Each structure stands twice: as C-alpha cells, then as structure tokens.
C-alpha cells in the first residue's frame, strides 16, 4: 500500500467516484513514473468505467481553468503530485 496522502482540494463528484479517482491515481503512481503516463492511465480507466470523454492533468506545478460536466470534476493531491480529472465533451 502507498504512503501517499490523498488531499481533495476541490470536487464536484460523488463520494464513490472521488474514491475511485484516488484509487486509480494511486495505481497509476505505483505503475508509472512519467506524469504523462500517469495522466493517460487515469484518463483511460475513467473513459472505460464512466464513459468518454475524460481529461487528466498530472504535475507538481500548474494552473488551470476548465469547463466540465456537472458532477464530473476532481482536483486533488496524492503526496506531492496534483491531479486534475474532469469530463468534458
């Protein structure tokens, strides 16, 4: 199990889906080291489980301003890494 602490900064998403996002991101961080690969893994998993089209941004330093579908947005930290996941389109 990972020692990364999940801190949800902002969410418009069901509790169940939020937990799924954290679990999925934890798996991605255990599997990959490159941020682009981590983001791709999370995006593809959410496309499969919750239907397209999901977008995922992973990094330590970024700003964002996005439009998302209602109840399909989460921004959280897993350890030092920020993850923005949202559905749009």
Curated annotation (Swiss-Prot):
Gene3D superfamilies: Protein Inhibitor Of Neuronal Nitric Oxide Synthase. Keywords: Cytoplasm, Cytoskeleton, Dynein, Microtubule, Motor protein, Transport. The keyword Chloroplast does not apply. It comes from the Eukaryota. CDD domains: DLC-like_DYNLL1_DYNLL2 (cd21452). GO terms for cellular component: centriole; cytoplasm; cytoplasmic dynein complex; cytosol; dynein complex; microtubule; nucleus; protein-containing complex. Disruption phenotype: Flies exhibit defects in bristle and wing development. PANTHER family: DYNEIN LIGHT CHAIN (PTHR11886:SF35). Pfam families: Dynein_light (PF01221). Acts as a non-catalytic accessory component of a dynein complex. Belongs to the dynein light chain family. PROSITE patterns: DYNEIN_LIGHT_1. It is found in: Cytoplasm, Cytoskeleton. Transmembrane segments: none annotated. This is Dynein light chain 1, cytoplasmic. Ubiquitous. InterPro entries: DLC_sf, Dynein_light_1/2_CS, Dynein_light_chain_typ-1/2. One of its GO terms (molecular function) is dynein intermediate chain binding. The keyword Transport applies. The gene is ctp. SMART domains: Dynein_light. Interacts with spn-F. Forms ternary complexes with spn-F and IKKepsilon. It comes from Drosophila melanogaster. One of its GO terms (biological process) is chaeta morphogenesis.
